[in-house]
Amino acid sequence: MTKITVVGAGSWGTALAMVLADNGHDVRIWGNRSELMDEINTKHENSRYLPGITLPSTIVAYSSLEEALVDVNVVLIVVPTKAYREVLQDMKKYVAGPTTWIHASKGIEPGTSKRISEVIEEEIPEDLIKDVVVLSGPSHAEEVGLRQATTVTSAAKRMEAAEEVQDLFMNSYFRVYTNPDIVGVELGGALKNIIALAAGITDGLGLGDNAKAALMTRGLTEIARLGRKMGGNPLTFAGLTGMGDLIVTCTSVHSRNWRAGNMLGKGHSLEEVLESMGMVVEGVRTTKAAHELAEKMEVEMPITAALYDVLFNGNNVKDAVGSLMGRVRKHEVEAIPDLL
């Protein structure tokens, strides 16, 4: 049995806490809403973020981060990307020694365009870091909460660390593979949110299956192109954290990014969409970060650029589709050299 603190009591943090508790670990979860923590402790449910799911009674919720981190040397962080530095700065006050830092957030830090593992390594002193591990893959919290079969990837620079996290989570309904490509795994999980937003727009516009299939395929090419330029293994993008996560996020009604895009495609403004969602839509911030990265690194990402113009420059979604369809003709295999 391992003592683990889950930092972040949203839908995904709560679902992962459930997996760990099902495996017999000593699980604590922290959130900044005291009434929500009380509900988890007394009613064993998180009605705001994971309604309808009965949580194991062994999960103990805290609204005090200091109390939640007592005698813990494994932490799992699942908070919005924009909150990471602030949360990490608080956490390092209370972590006592070398700790395994797992993160399961899919995004890029706004403003710096850094991967979350980079943010952790910047904010946490070396003597408090045993390993940094990423948990990512095609996994909606709603289905994990129902204990439906789910498969994800544990990635770390040190494979033994990835395997240790694999062992923490593996059970009859939650399968975990390992991968040493922490860069590719993080970027696949973050960048697919951009394509999911665009896929939602195509569905909102009623463009049909042909358009959506093309968008997803060419979107994966963009993800792999930028990922390779940043040091990721191109094979990673054909796996669970690339193609797998892209498929589930572009096709499921559980996907916040798809739902947001669908509303945009039906004519709602970005402000209306974000207000109605009630939860973080990482793809919006990631689109901005990825667009800036692509320009800086001189990587061609036409879908990302078109979505950026829709979200931040007020471009019409139909005009964006037209601009993509009207691009200069190309050979499909022109992208291949970038991926080898």
Curated annotation (Swiss-Prot):
InterPro entries named among the record's database cross-references: 6-PGluconate_DH-like_C_sf, 6PGD_dom2, G3P_DH_NAD-dep, G3P_DH_NAD-dep_C, G3P_DH_NAD-dep_N, NAD(P)-bd_dom_sf
Catalytic-site annotation from UniProt: 192 (proton acceptor)
Q: Which GO terms describe its cellular component?
A: cytosol
User: For NADPH, which residues are the binding ones?
Assistant: 11-12, 33, 106, 141, 256, 280, 282
Tell me the pathway. Answer: Membrane lipid metabolism; glycerophospholipid metabolism
GO molecular-function annotation terms? glycerol-3-phosphate dehydrogenase [NAD(P)+] activity; NAD binding
- Where in the chain are disulfide-linked cysteines found? none
Q: Which domain of life is it from?
A: Bacteria
What does the record give as the reaction this protein catalyses?
Answer: sn-glycerol 3-phosphate + NAD(+) = dihydroxyacetone phosphate + NADH + H(+); sn-glycerol 3-phosphate + NADP(+) = dihydroxyacetone phosphate + NADPH + H(+)
Q: What is its subcellular localisation?
A: Cytoplasm
Q: Which PROSITE patterns match?
A: NAD_G3PDH
**Binding residues for sn-glycerol 3-phosphate:** 106, 137, 139, 192, 245, 255-257
**Which GO BP terms sit in this record?**
carbohydrate metabolic process; glycerol-3-phosphate biosynthetic process; glycerol-3-phosphate catabolic process; glycerophospholipid metabolic process; phospholipid biosynthetic process
Q: What is its EC number?
A: 1.1.1.94
Q: Name one Pfam family in it.
A: NAD_Gly3P_dh_C
Q: What is its main location?
A: cytoplasm
Keyword tags: Cytoplasm, Lipid biosynthesis, Lipid metabolism, NAD, NADP, Nucleotide-binding, Oxidoreductase, Phospholipid biosynthesis, Phospholipid metabolism
Q: Which family, according to UniProt? A: Belongs to the NAD-dependent glycerol-3-phosphate dehydrogenase family.
**Main function:** Catalyzes the reduction of the glycolytic intermediate dihydroxyacetone phosphate (DHAP) to sn-glycerol 3-phosphate (G3P), the key precursor for phospholipid synthesis.
What is the name attached to this protein's record? Glycerol-3-phosphate dehydrogenase [NAD(P)+]
The coding gene here is: gpsA
